[in-house]
From Swiss-Prot:
Pathway(s): Cofactor biosynthesis; thiamine diphosphate biosynthesis; thiamine diphosphate from thiamine: step 1/1
Keywords of the record: ATP-binding, Kinase, Nucleotide-binding, Transferase
Residue ranges of coiled coil: none
A Pfam family that the UniProt record links to this protein: TPK_B1_binding
Complex and partners: Homodimer.
Superkingdom to which the source organism belongs: Eukaryota
CDD domains the UniProt entry points to: TPK
Organism: Bos taurus
Claim: Transferase is one of the keywords in the record: yes
Cited Gene3D superfamilies: Thiamin pyrophosphokinase, catalytic domain, Thiamin pyrophosphokinase, thiamin-binding domain
EC number assigned by the record: 2.7.6.-
Cysteine disulfide links: none
Keyword Nucleotide-binding attached: yes
Name of the protein this chain belongs to: Thiamine pyrophosphokinase 1
Length: 243
């Protein structure tokens, strides 16, 4: 079975995918308002609420998340109080073996099921800048996500998007006009022994990807508008978002 996705669809004014939005503890991009208004359900992971609070000064009534979850070591007291007073659900998830992002996905999936929402994707803002250990924690959550939700989970920050391709065949539509000029395939978890692609300037044919051998960075598109990837192990897709 081939898995088809248009990764940048949520950023399009005419985008058709239904999605939920997760805000992580990093500065919010200019696409934040667009993503917020189109989302079916909105959540903040701990300190993500600080950034939401700060960037919406003067219009906070229009930007109330359905819930804020986390161990609450990052959210400022006045921010937590503000959203609690406004009726946002405050959910403590103290487990230190998982990140606030991972735990937020768990809560979000339960909400989707409780509300019987028809959702195509989970869009995450933040998690790809600043501290390298936290960037890798975001990637680790993508590896855990299939045990939490059947929905594709993408992470967006500034000019980058990442999405973890599971073993199998994938079709990525890259003809929205929002794509930047670079893309890549990163074998983060373990080497991929058999990777075959079409639609890239530098395609792979039954090739191995692995750190210390070959990593497909700074690739680009062949102009066809569609990239196909077949992989035998999880493989991280990354792509540029046009400013």
């Amino acid at each position: 079975m081939e898995h088809a996705i248009t990764p940048l669809d949520p950023l399009l004014p005419s985008g058709s995918l239904k999605y939920c939005l997760v805000i992580l503890n990093q500065p919010l991009d200019k696409c934040f308002r667009h993503l917020w208004h189109k989302a079916l359900l909105r959540a903040c992971a701990d300190g993500g609420a600080n950034h939401l609070y700060d960037v919406t000064e003067g219009e906070r009534e229009s930007f109330l998340p359905e819930f804020i979850s986390g161990d609450f070591d990052s959210i400022r007291p006045e921010v937590r109080e503000h959203y609690a007073i406004k009726g946002c659900e405050i959910i403590s998830t103290p487990d230190q073996d998982h990140t606030d992002f991972t735990k937020c996905l768990e809560v979000l999936q339960k909400k989707i099921e409780e509300k019987d929402l028809q959702v195509d994707m989970i869009v995450t803002l933040g998690g790809l800048a600043g501290r390298f250990d936290q960037i890798m924690a975001s990637v680790s959550t993508l590896f855990q996500a299939p045990q939490i939700t059947s929905l594709p989970v993408i992470i967006i920050q500034e000019e980058s998007l990442i999405y973890l391709l599971q073993p199998g065949k994938h079709k990525l539509h890259v003809d929205t006009g929002m794509e930047g000029d670079w893309c890549g395939l990163i074998p983060v978890g373990q080497p991929c022994n058999q990777v075959t692609t079409t639609g890239l300037k530098w395609n792979l044919t039954h090739q191995m990807l692995g750190f210390g051998t070959l990593v497909s960075t700074s690739n680009t598109y062949d102009g066809s508008g569609v990239v196909t990837v077949e992989t035998d192990h999880p493989l991280l897709w990354t792509m540029a978002i046009k400013n």
